Amino acid sequence: MNIQQLEYLIAVDKYKHFGKAALACHVTQPTLSAMIQKLEDELSIKIFDRTTHPIRTTDAGDEIISSAKAVLDDITELKNKAHSLNNVLAGKINLGIIPTVSGFLIPNEIFDFLNQNQKIEMNIHEMNTENIIKSLKSGEIDAGIISTPYHETEEFFSDFLFNEELLIYSSYDNKDEYFIGSEDFNSDKFWLLEEGNCLRKQMETICHLRENSLKPKNLEFSASSISTLIKMVDKTGGITVLPELATQQLSEEQKKKVFHFKKPFPSREISLIYYKPTYKQKMLNEFGAFIKEALSKHLNYNKNPKDFSIIAPE
């Protein structure tokens, strides 16, 4: 029995298909099948029922898979602990990140961090805040990047990363006005993210949608991503709210549709949270410091913080 065989087991259990598992493990299907068969023979247990489509993990196999995952987790922990004791920035970080941040941090700051720290491996999972909290508690991830303050994070450790302004993206006609209040909105197309997204709640708070001071005809429409919101405004007009990092990736023509709210400018706070300090703390600290430094000079909030108001994501 070896580590590779355990990894193959978990892959087949995940994909329920030998071909897909082999592809994910970067080996040929015959090699993977032979290694699993060898392990089944060694343990005298049938782990997978190959007669079903998709492949089914047997009851005994479920127990073996659970133990295999625990063994691999222990091995990863041992490696990371050794790196930590040697004061080396190396190991694996499982990171959960909310979708309205991931699309702008991953291709830029996170890639830069990993390029500068080649011995750190990062597995990134795009999740909403609720699932990040659950995954932290269960130990599935080591840390999460979310919008704070959030009521369920009181038992967590939190490392502030950055504040970013929330801006209007609109086909608003009066191009002479640079600052807009929610009372100035005159549109029956207010595009929102889907329920469960913390940025949607911030949109509702800023624009007083909960109090019905603005009641668009199609308020029930909800998008799954910021890029969809941008496309809806570009194609059909209307209004939405974008975080500042999203506006930095717009074309020059699109940037003409960006407006500030009136003071105090609404903004959101983004933090790195984790359940408890671990041997991965040095890596997490370095990662957080890198993100702070990378964004400190590029966000409006840092120019004059007293002009901004943090909007809670709930």
Give the predicted meaning of each segment.
Residues 153-159, 163-164, 227-277:
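Beta-alpha-beta core module
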Residues 156-191, 195:
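Flexible hinge/capping segments at coil-to-helix
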Residues 90-153, 223-225:
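Central regulatory/effector-binding core of bacterial HTH transcription factors
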Residues 176, 188-212, 280-282, 288, ...:
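Secondary-structure junction motif
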Residues 42-43, 64-86, 287, 301:
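Alpha-helical linker/hinge and terminal dimerization helices associated
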Residues 1-29, 33-35, 49-51, 64, ...:
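N-terminal short secondary-structure element
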Residues 40-59:
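A short LG(V/I)-centered, amphipathic sequence patch enriched
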Residues 110-117, 140, 200-216:
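Ligand-binding cleft/hinge of the Venus flytrap
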